[in-house]
UniProtKB/Swiss-Prot annotation:
It is a peripheral membrane protein. This is Plastocyanin, chloroplastic. InterPro entries: BlueCu_1, BlueCu_1_BS, Copper_blue_Plastocyanin, Cupredoxin, Plastocyanin. NCBIfam families: cyanin_plasto (TIGR02656). Participates in electron transfer between P700 and the cytochrome b6-f complex in photosystem I. The gene is PETE. Residues 1-47 form a transit peptide.
């Protein structure tokens, strides 16, 4: 009589190929990446407008020079280059009834990254300039719809 050895029965559900786990992890990472990217795009679409005070090249200009926003949006001015800049709205180049002093920033933003924010609600064009660099052409316009 011969002895027969039998391997213990294995459960198919307990054995998972490594490749499947790696593939599943890659799918999860891929979906998570798409979700994060979608969230970032959604947030960017609803973000306030930003104007740089000074170009990346070092030029004395507002970037963008002209900006169009919707009524009630906030414009964030960011000192990009570290030169002293301010934001002065020209009382003769803003909608009637808007107080230029109330929306201007006369004090200088001296360091890179310093910001000034203003919420504009009255429709129309808002002309503004940087007082120390106006002669160099540092002027801008915001169109509020």
């Amino acid at each position: 009589m011969k002895a027969t050895l039998r391997a213990p029965a294995s459960r198919a559900s307990a054995v998972r190929p490594v490749a499947s786990l790696k593939a599943a992890a890659q799918r999860v990472a891929s979906v998570a990446g798409v979700s994060v990217a979608s969230l970032a795009l959604t947030l960017a679409a609803h973000a306030d407008a930003t104007v740089k005070l000074g170009a990346d090249s070092g030029a004395l200009e507002f970037v963008p020079k002209t900006l169009t926003i919707k009524s009630g949006e906030t414009v964030n001015f960011v000192n990009n280059a570290g030169f002293p800049h301010n934001i002065v709205f020209d009382e003769d180049a803003i909608p009637s009834g808007v107080n230029a002093d109330a929306i201007s920033r006369d004090d200088y933003l001296n360091a890179p990254g310093e910001t000034y924010s203003v919420k504009l609600t009255a429709a129309g064009e808002y002309g503004y300039y940087c007082e120390p660099h106006q002669g160099a052409g540092m002027v801008g316009k915001i169109i509020v719809q």
